[in-house]
């Protein structure tokens, strides 16, 4: 059954990002920010509690150490540095999960770290080095180093499809610094096609292969609530 995942807990101190309270009942999996691109100790625990309240599974959403750039700027780090960076973040979230008696469901890298791992086997291996510590599945995209390296290293692989981002002609994701509003009905239609046909349209209207074990909706998309509701309703109708 295809799930809906959403990046959550991305507020920081007095700064707000996303409508987590409204989004949480609409999703099945929350990727919780771990402090390096967004969030802090108070928001992490608050988000874990909110997910528990709505019976939403929780995964870690670690980032490059780029709080000012929201984790959407690339950095050069050694494999050991990167693995330690991820272990540090996931370990922090795991402490809050244990405090609330909630299991760690998966790890999904954030932003530029996600994009780098899709292209670079060295970065993907660093992520696996961290995942080895926590013995948890990894979320990523088919046809990339995510799938190749994660599977080769023996990690369960959750293939995701992005509801609110564009794909390039080679099937890679176009990661932008800021997200724009999208048409909920069009997004829902794209998601259903991704599930049924394993295809989506690129920015130049070419079909590229995808797989949608889980569908991602970003909480910082301006109309994220409407998008999540449209995707949820489409999936519910498909199952009936």
Regions found by a protein language model. Name each.
Residues 21-25, 46-59, 98-99:
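Acidic (Asp/Glu)-rich catalytic clusters
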Residues 7, 61, 107, 217:
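Conserved, mostly hydrophobic/aromatic
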Residues 66-101, 106:
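Glycine/small-residue-rich loop that forms an oxyanion/phosphate-binding "nest" at active or ligand-binding sites
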Residues 51, 193, 224-240:
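C-terminal helical cap(s) of enzyme catalytic domains, especially alpha/beta-barrels
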């Amino acid at each position: 059954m295809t799930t809906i995942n959403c990046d959550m807990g991305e507020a920081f101190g007095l700064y707000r990002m996303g409508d987590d309270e409204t989004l949480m009942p609409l999703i099945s999996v929350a990727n919780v920010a771990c402090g390096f691109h967004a969030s802090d100790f108070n928001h992490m625990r608050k988000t874990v509690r909110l997910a528990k309240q709505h019976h939403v599974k929780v995964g870690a959403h670690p980032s490059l150490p780029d709080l000012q750039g929201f984790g959407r700027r690339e950095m050069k780090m050694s494999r050991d540095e990167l693995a330690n960076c991820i272990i540090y973040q996931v370990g922090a979230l795991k402490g809050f999960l244990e405090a609330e008696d909630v299991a760690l469901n998966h790890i999904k890298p954030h932003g530029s770290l996600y994009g780098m791992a899709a292209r670079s086997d060295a970065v993907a291996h660093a992520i696996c080095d961290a995942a080895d510590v926590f013995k948890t599945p990894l979320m990523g995209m088919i046809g990339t180093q995510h799938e190749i390296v994660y599977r080769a290293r023996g990690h369960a692989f959750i293939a995701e499809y992005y509801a609110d981002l564009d794909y390039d002609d080679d099937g890679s994701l176009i990661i932008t610094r800021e997200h724009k509003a999208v048409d909920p009905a069009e997004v829902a239609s794209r998601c259903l096609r991704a599930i049924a046909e394993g295809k989506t349209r690129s920015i130049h209207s070419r079909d590229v292969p995808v797989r949608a074990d889980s569908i991602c909706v970003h909480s910082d998309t301006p109309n994220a609530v409407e998008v999540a509701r449209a995707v949820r309703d489409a999936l519910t109708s498909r199952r009936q």
